[in-house]
């Protein structure tokens, strides 16, 4: 426990005395009081470079008063690396530490096929063509296609767990998934594509009607994923209780809207 008691002060000619309360704070990690070089506890005097890096009184003379951290930071700040997707056409270069941020938004990032027994991965538009040619019939492809912002019927068996659909305006696959749990059936929708501006952003609405009662779930922003997860979602889902299920068939309606093009 670190404590600090501020002294009493006097104000004005009347000698008014103002006492400030004692304040205390708790240090949760004592390791921050160790020298980052030798890992021994810091003691006075403590040496600090102009960039804020610390060294204890024993280490500073050994380093000839030169900060060991600053040169490495300068090196990292001067390293430009190419995108891992350069073999697929990306020409972007970025600072070493920005790699993960760029990969999430790179239009050339690979997306995995949502079919469980398929190991194909490719650009989201190539994945669209692959899925069309490899995994479905022409009749299914025609049936499970709709226009953006227009609600359409998307019935699916709970045991199927996943249904792939698309919109006329985009070469993008959308995954409608359901998960049976003890409290009911979770239904969620995701866009199989990277988080690139070129892909666009989508909102969606799911509705489920039973005995003339309708449940509606609206999401202002659909999640974009490069690989579909088959684990029960923790957020962004509609939950249909078991007492509202009448069969294995989920008779739902779905509407997807591209929000990035709206004024």
Curated annotation (Swiss-Prot):
Q: Which principal EC class is assigned to this enzyme? A: transferase
Binding-site list for Zn(2+) 1: 83, 90, 102, 106
Question: Which controlled-vocabulary keywords does the entry list?
Answer: Metal-binding, Transferase, Ubl conjugation pathway, Zinc, Zinc-finger
What processes in GO biological process is this protein linked to?
Answer: protein ubiquitination
The record lists Zn(2+) 2 as bound by 113, 118, 130, 135
Report the pathway entry: Protein modification; protein ubiquitination
The record ties this protein, via Pfam families, to: Sina_RING (PF21362), Sina_ZnF (PF21361)
List its EC numbers: 2.3.2.27
Q: Which Gene3D superfamilies match?
A: Zinc/RING finger domain, C3HC4 (zinc finger)
Chain segments carrying region SBD: 75-261
What the entry lists under InterPro entries is as follows: Sina-like_RING, SINL_plant, Znf_RING/FYVE/PHD, Znf_SIAH
Chain intervals annotated as zinc finger (SIAH-type)? 78-136
ZnF RING-type span: 35-71
An example Gene Ontology molecular-function term: zinc ion binding
Please list the reactions this protein catalyses. S-ubiquitinyl-[E2 ubiquitin-conjugating enzyme]-L-cysteine + [acceptor protein]-L-lysine = [E2 ubiquitin-conjugating enzyme]-L-cysteine + N(6)-ubiquitinyl-[acceptor protein]-L-lysine
Q: Domain annotation text?
A: The RING-type zinc finger domain is essential for ubiquitin ligase activity. The SBD domain (substrate-binding domain) mediates the homodimerization and the interaction with substrate proteins. It is related to the TRAF family.
Relate the protein's function as given in its record: E3 ubiquitin-protein ligase that mediates ubiquitination and subsequent proteasomal degradation of target proteins. E3 ubiquitin ligases accept ubiquitin from an E2 ubiquitin-conjugating enzyme in the form of a thioester and then directly transfers the ubiquitin to targeted substrates. It probably triggers the ubiquitin-mediated degradation of different substrates.
Q: Which family does it belong to?
A: Belongs to the SINA (Seven in absentia) family.
Could you identify this protein by its name?
E3 ubiquitin-protein ligase SINA-like 8
Q: What is the lineage of its organism?
A: Eukaryota, Viridiplantae, Streptophyta, Embryophyta, Tracheophyta
């Amino acid at each position: 426990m670190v404590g600090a008691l501020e002294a009493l002060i006097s104000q004005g000619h009347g000698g008014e005395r103002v006492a400030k309360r004692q304040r205390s704070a708790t240090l949760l990690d004592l390791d921050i009081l160790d020298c980052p070089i030798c890992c021994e506890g810091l003691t006075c005097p403590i040496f600090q470079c102009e960039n804020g890096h610390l060294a204890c009184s024993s280490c500073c003379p050994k380093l000839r008063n030169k900060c060991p951290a600053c040169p490495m930071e300068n090196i990292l700040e001067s390293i430009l690396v190419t995108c891992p997707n350069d073999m697929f056409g990306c020409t972007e270069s970025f600072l070493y530490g920005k790699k993960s941020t760029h990969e999430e938004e790179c239009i050339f990032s690979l997306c995995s096929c949502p079919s469980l027994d398929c190991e194909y991965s490719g650009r989201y538009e190539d994945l669209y063509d692959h899925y069309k040619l490899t995994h479905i019939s022409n009749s299914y492809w025609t049936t499970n296609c709709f226009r953006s912002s227009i609600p359409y019927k998307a019935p699916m068996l709970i045991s199927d767990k996943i249904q792939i659909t698309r919109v006329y305006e985009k070469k993008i696959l959308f995954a409608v998934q359901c998960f049976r749990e003890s409290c009911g059936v979770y239904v969620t929708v995701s866009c199989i594509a990277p988080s690139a501006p070129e892909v666009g952003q989508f909102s969606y609405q799911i509705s489920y009607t039973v005995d003339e009662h309708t449940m509606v779930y609206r999401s202002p922003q659909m999640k974009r994923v490069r690989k579909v997860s088959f684990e029960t979602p923790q957020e962004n889902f509609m939950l249909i209780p078991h007492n509202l299920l009448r069969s294995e068939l989920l008779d739902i309606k779905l509407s997807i809207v591209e929000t990035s093009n709206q004024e």
